[in-house]
C-alpha cells in the first residue's frame, strides 16, 4: 500500500510518499510544492498551483490513500483562513483523484513519529530519517508530510489489529453459547 502525506501551506506545501509492506515502511519520494515565487495578493493563482502540484504528485507516484495535516488555530485569524484555503485546495486535488483522505493533527503526527506530541521540527526530521533509513535529513515540510504518511501507516495497522481482535466469531460468542441465536 502506498500512502501520500501532505503538509499543507500557502507558500510551501510538503509531500511525502511511503510504501507500506507489512510491518516495513519504505521511502518512495518527498518534496515541496512552492508558491513563494508568486505575487502575494494573487490567492486564486496560488491555490491553483497547489491543486495542480498535488494532482501531479498523485499522477506520478500513484498512492492508494492520502494523509493530510489538520489546520491548527493560529493567533492571527487571517493566517488561519489562508492556511485553511491552501489545505482545501490540497484535499480537493486528492479527492478529485479518487483518494481516501485521512486527517491528523500535528500533535498526533509528532507522537506517532517521535513519541512525543510536542517534538520540534528537528526531532521529527531526525525520526523520519531513521524510520525510513534515509541518507540525509529531509526538509522540514517534506519531513512533516512523510511523518503524516507514517502516522497513517501506523494507524492503519492499529485499526486492522483491533478489528481482528474484536471481530465476532460465529458460534464463539458468549450469547451463542448461552443459546441466544440471532
Curated annotation (Swiss-Prot):
- Check the record and name the Pfam families matching this protein: RuvC
Provide the family line.
Answer: Belongs to the RuvC family.
Presence of the UniProt keyword DNA-binding in the record = yes
Q: So what does this one do?
A: The RuvA-RuvB-RuvC complex processes Holliday junction (HJ) DNA during genetic recombination and DNA repair. Endonuclease that resolves HJ intermediates. Cleaves cruciform DNA by making single-stranded nicks across the HJ at symmetrical positions within the homologous arms, yielding a 5'-phosphate and a 3'-hydroxyl group; requires a central core of homology in the junction. The consensus cleavage sequence is 5'-(A/T)TT(C/G)-3'. Cleavage occurs on the 3'-side of the TT dinucleotide at the point of strand exchange.
Please name the GO terms of the biological process aspect recorded for this protein, alphabetically: DNA recombination; DNA repair
Q: Which GO terms describe its molecular function?
A: crossover junction DNA endonuclease activity; DNA binding; magnesium ion binding
Cofactor (UniProt): Mg(2+)
Q: Where is the active site?
A: 7, 69, 141
Q: Which residues bind Mg(2+) 1?
A: 7, 141
Q: Cofactor stoichiometry and binding?
A: Binds 2 Mg(2+) ion per subunit.
Q: Which reaction does it catalyse?
A: Endonucleolytic cleavage at a junction such as a reciprocal single-stranded crossover between two homologous DNA duplexes (Holliday junction)
| Chief location bin | cytoplasm
Q: What's this protein's name?
A: Crossover junction endodeoxyribonuclease RuvC
Q: How does it assemble?
A: Homodimer which binds Holliday junction (HJ) DNA. The HJ becomes 2-fold symmetrical on binding to RuvC with unstacked arms; it has a different conformation from HJ DNA in complex with RuvA. In the full resolvosome a probable DNA-RuvA(4)-RuvB(12)-RuvC(2) complex forms which resolves the HJ.
Which gene underlies this protein? ruvC
Q: What class of enzyme is it?
A: hydrolase
> What is the annotated localization of this protein?
Cytoplasm
Keywords for this entry?
Cytoplasm, DNA damage, DNA recombination, DNA repair, DNA-binding, Endonuclease, Hydrolase, Magnesium, Metal-binding, Nuclease
Show the HAMAP family listed in the entry: RuvC
Enzyme Commission number(s) from the entry: 3.1.21.10
Q: Known InterPro entries for this protein?
A: RNaseH-like_sf, RNaseH_sf, X-over_junc_endoDNase_Mg_BS, X-over_junc_endoDNase_RuvC
**DNA damage listed as a keyword:** yes
What is any one of the record's Gene Ontology cellular component terms?
Answer: cytoplasm
Q: What residues does Mg(2+) 2 bind to?
A: 69
